[in-house]
Amino acid sequence: MIQMQSVLDVADNTGARSVMCIKVLGGSHRRYAGVGDIIKVSIKDAAPRGRVKKGDVYNAVVVRTAKGVRRPDGSLVRFDGNAAVLLNNKLEPIGTRIFGPVTRELRTEKFMKIVSLAPEVL
Protein backbone atom coordinates (compact mmCIF):
# COMPACT_ATOMS: atom_id res chain seq x y z
CA MET A 1 0.00 0.00 0.00
CA ILE A 2 1.77 3.08 -1.31
CA GLN A 3 0.65 6.64 -0.62
CA MET A 4 2.09 10.11 -1.11
CA GLN A 5 5.52 10.53 0.56
CA SER A 6 6.16 6.74 0.54
CA VAL A 7 9.77 5.88 -0.32
CA LEU A 8 10.28 2.90 -2.64
CA ASP A 9 13.31 1.00 -3.93
CA VAL A 10 13.86 0.93 -7.69
CA ALA A 11 13.86 -2.54 -9.28
CA ASP A 12 15.54 -1.68 -12.60
CA ASN A 13 18.89 -0.55 -14.02
CA THR A 14 18.05 3.10 -14.73
CA GLY A 15 20.51 4.30 -12.08
CA ALA A 16 17.89 5.41 -9.56
CA ARG A 17 18.21 3.77 -6.14
CA SER A 18 15.20 5.16 -4.29
CA VAL A 19 12.15 7.19 -5.26
CA MET A 20 9.38 9.00 -3.40
CA CYS A 21 5.75 8.76 -4.44
CA ILE A 22 4.41 12.25 -5.13
CA LYS A 23 1.01 11.25 -6.58
CA VAL A 24 -1.15 8.15 -6.94
CA LEU A 25 -2.64 8.25 -10.45
CA GLY A 26 -6.20 7.22 -11.31
CA GLY A 27 -9.08 9.13 -9.74
CA SER A 28 -9.26 12.60 -8.25
CA HIS A 29 -8.91 11.63 -4.57
CA ARG A 30 -7.22 8.24 -4.85
CA ARG A 31 -5.18 7.63 -1.72
CA TYR A 32 -3.37 4.27 -2.04
CA ALA A 33 -1.57 2.32 -4.76
CA GLY A 34 -0.94 -1.42 -4.81
CA VAL A 35 0.90 -3.82 -7.12
CA GLY A 36 0.31 -2.91 -10.78
CA ASP A 37 -0.80 0.67 -10.08
CA ILE A 38 0.89 3.65 -11.72
CA ILE A 39 2.28 6.44 -9.54
CA LYS A 40 4.25 9.67 -10.08
CA VAL A 41 7.66 9.55 -8.40
CA SER A 42 10.57 11.88 -7.70
CA ILE A 43 14.11 10.45 -7.76
CA LYS A 44 15.63 10.77 -4.27
CA ASP A 45 18.90 8.82 -4.68
CA ALA A 46 20.65 8.01 -7.96
CA ALA A 47 23.91 6.47 -9.18
CA PRO A 48 26.43 8.97 -10.60
CA ARG A 49 26.38 7.74 -14.22
CA GLY A 50 22.80 6.48 -14.49
CA ARG A 51 20.11 7.41 -17.02
CA VAL A 52 18.18 9.44 -14.43
CA LYS A 53 19.27 12.09 -11.96
CA LYS A 54 18.12 13.22 -8.53
CA GLY A 55 15.06 15.45 -8.62
CA ASP A 56 13.66 14.12 -11.91
CA VAL A 57 9.95 13.23 -11.98
CA TYR A 58 8.79 10.03 -13.70
CA ASN A 59 5.87 7.65 -13.87
CA ALA A 60 6.45 4.30 -12.17
CA VAL A 61 4.58 1.04 -11.70
CA VAL A 62 4.55 -0.62 -8.28
CA VAL A 63 5.95 -4.18 -8.60
CA ARG A 64 6.38 -5.22 -4.93
CA THR A 65 4.68 -4.14 -1.69
CA ALA A 66 5.14 -5.11 1.93
CA LYS A 67 1.33 -5.06 2.24
CA GLY A 68 1.07 -7.90 -0.26
CA VAL A 69 -1.46 -9.08 -2.82
CA ARG A 70 -4.44 -11.31 -2.01
CA ARG A 71 -5.07 -14.02 -4.61
CA PRO A 72 -8.49 -15.51 -5.47
CA ASP A 73 -7.50 -18.80 -3.81
CA GLY A 74 -6.96 -16.96 -0.50
CA SER A 75 -3.15 -16.95 -0.54
CA LEU A 76 -1.19 -13.76 0.16
CA VAL A 77 2.03 -12.78 -1.63
CA ARG A 78 4.09 -10.36 0.48
CA PHE A 79 7.58 -8.87 0.12
CA ASP A 80 10.14 -7.40 2.52
CA GLY A 81 9.94 -3.95 0.96
CA ASN A 82 8.25 -1.74 -1.60
CA ALA A 83 9.68 -1.49 -5.12
CA ALA A 84 8.81 0.22 -8.39
CA VAL A 85 9.96 0.22 -12.03
CA LEU A 86 10.40 3.59 -13.76
CA LEU A 87 8.32 4.28 -16.88
CA ASN A 88 8.52 6.88 -19.65
CA ASN A 89 5.56 9.01 -20.80
CA LYS A 90 4.33 6.15 -23.03
CA LEU A 91 4.29 3.91 -19.90
CA GLU A 92 7.14 1.73 -21.23
CA PRO A 93 10.00 0.71 -18.90
CA ILE A 94 13.05 2.99 -19.10
CA GLY A 95 15.47 0.31 -17.89
CA THR A 96 16.55 -2.81 -19.78
CA ARG A 97 16.78 -5.11 -16.75
CA ILE A 98 14.50 -5.83 -13.78
CA PHE A 99 15.91 -6.94 -10.42
CA GLY A 100 14.08 -9.21 -8.00
CA PRO A 101 10.76 -11.02 -8.32
CA VAL A 102 7.50 -9.49 -9.56
CA THR A 103 3.94 -10.71 -9.05
CA ARG A 104 1.66 -12.40 -11.58
CA GLU A 105 -0.78 -9.48 -11.23
CA LEU A 106 1.44 -7.46 -13.63
CA ARG A 107 0.58 -9.81 -16.52
CA THR A 108 -1.71 -7.32 -18.24
CA GLU A 109 -1.41 -5.91 -21.74
CA LYS A 110 0.45 -2.84 -20.36
CA PHE A 111 3.21 -4.52 -18.34
CA MET A 112 4.10 -7.74 -20.22
CA LYS A 113 7.51 -6.21 -20.99
CA ILE A 114 8.28 -5.97 -17.25
CA VAL A 115 7.10 -9.55 -16.66
CA SER A 116 9.30 -10.84 -19.50
CA LEU A 117 12.38 -8.99 -18.18
CA ALA A 118 11.89 -10.12 -14.57
CA PRO A 119 14.04 -13.03 -13.33
CA GLU A 120 11.15 -14.52 -11.34
CA VAL A 121 7.36 -14.18 -11.45
CA LEU A 122 5.48 -15.15 -8.28
Swiss-Prot record:
Q: Does the keyword RNA-binding belong to this entry?
A: yes
Which GO terms fall under molecular function for this chain's record?
A: large ribosomal subunit rRNA binding; structural constituent of ribosome
InterPro entries per the UniProt record, alphabetical: Ribosomal_uL14, Ribosomal_uL14_bac-type, Ribosomal_uL14_CS, Ribosomal_uL14_sf
Q: Name one GO biological process term.
A: translation
Keyword match Ligase: no
Which keywords accompany this UniProt record?
Ribonucleoprotein, Ribosomal protein, RNA-binding, rRNA-binding
Task: Output a single Gene Ontology CC term carried by this record.
Answer: cytosolic large ribosomal subunit
Q: Which domain of life is it from?
A: Bacteria
The family note in this entry says: Belongs to the universal ribosomal protein uL14 family.
| Described purpose of this protein according to its UniProt entry | Binds to 23S rRNA. Forms part of two intersubunit bridges in the 70S ribosome.
What HAMAP family has UniProt attached to this entry? Ribosomal_uL14
Q: How does it assemble?
A: Part of the 50S ribosomal subunit. Forms a cluster with proteins L3 and L19. In the 70S ribosome, L14 and L19 interact and together make contacts with the 16S rRNA in bridges B5 and B8.
Q: What is the name of the protein in this document?
A: Large ribosomal subunit protein uL14
